[in-house]
Amino acid sequence: MKNKIFIIIFASSLLAGCWNSGGHGDETYIVATDATLAPMSFMSVGNDMIGFEPDLIRAIADKAKINISLVNVEWAGLFGGLITKKFDMIISSVTVLEERKQRMGFSIPYLKSGLTLVVRKDEKKITSFEDAKNNNVLVGAQIGTTAYYFLEKESSIKTKGYQMYGHAISDLINGKIHAVLGESSGTLFLKNQPLFQEVKIVGEILSNEFYAVVLRKDENQLMTQINLAIKKLIADGTIAQLHKKWDLGQAAQVP
C-alpha cells in the first residue's frame, strides 16, 4: 500500500513540476527536492514548487540544455530514491560530506551556508551554542541533516530527531525541547514568519557547508553538463541574482 501511495504522489508531483527548457530532446530528468524549507524550496499557496533551488535547477536545465521535472519528496526518502532510480537528481540544500560521496555523486557547489541555533524568546540562559553545551539541554534537529550529525558529535547535548524542521520549532514553542539547530538561510528567512514570532536566533552561524546537486555516481556525462551549467550561472551572475531575489542575505553566499 505504501508503494502505491508513493506512486500516486510521485505522479502528481511530476504533473505539477514539469519544466521543458525548450528544444533539448525527448529525455526528461526527474529532480527531487524536499519542498518544506523556505526560501530554499517550498510550496506556494497555489501549490506550485517555488524557491531559490527550484529557480536554480530550472536555470541549470536551460544552460545544460536538458528537460527536467521537479518532484516533492520528504527528506528521509531523497537519497534512497536517487540510488534506487526513482529520480535522477536531488537539489535540496544537500551538504557535501565525505560519507555521502561514497554513495552518490556531487556537483560543484552552488551555495555556501551554515547552521543556526533557535530558542524561545523568553530564554535567558542560552545565548549561544556554547551555552547549550554547558547547560546540558535538549536540542531538536531534522533527522538525516548536517544539523543532526553536528549534534550527535556533541556528547554534552541531548538530541531529539524530527522528520520535519517545522515540527521541531513547534515543540520548542510548546516547551518540549530547549532549542533547535537548523540550516541558516531557511532559519533566517523564517524568522519574520508567524510561527517564528515566539522564538529567536542566538549566537553565530556554525560550520561552513557547501550545497551541491546530487546525482548517481555513474552519471558522468550528466554531471559534466550540470557542473558546466553551474560554472556559467556563477560567472554570469544568475545565482547571485537568485540569492538576492530570495533574500538569502548573509546566511548563505555564492561560492
Region spans (language model):
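A ligand-binding cleft/hinge motif common to bilobed small-molecule-binding domains
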Residues: 80, 92-102, 150-153, 173, ...
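Flexible hinge/capping segments at coil-to-helix
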Residues: 120-137
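Extracytoplasmic small-molecule ligand-binding "clamshell" domains
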Residues: 24-93, 102
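Short helix-initiation/N-cap motifs at beta->coil->alpha
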Residues: 54, 69-80, 127, 160-174, ...
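Beta->alpha turn/N-cap motifs
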Residues: 32-37, 71-76, 85-97, 142-145, ...
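Ligand-binding clefts/hinges and TM-proximal coupling segments of bilobed small-molecule sensing domains
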Residues: 20-21, 146-162, 201-202, 230-255
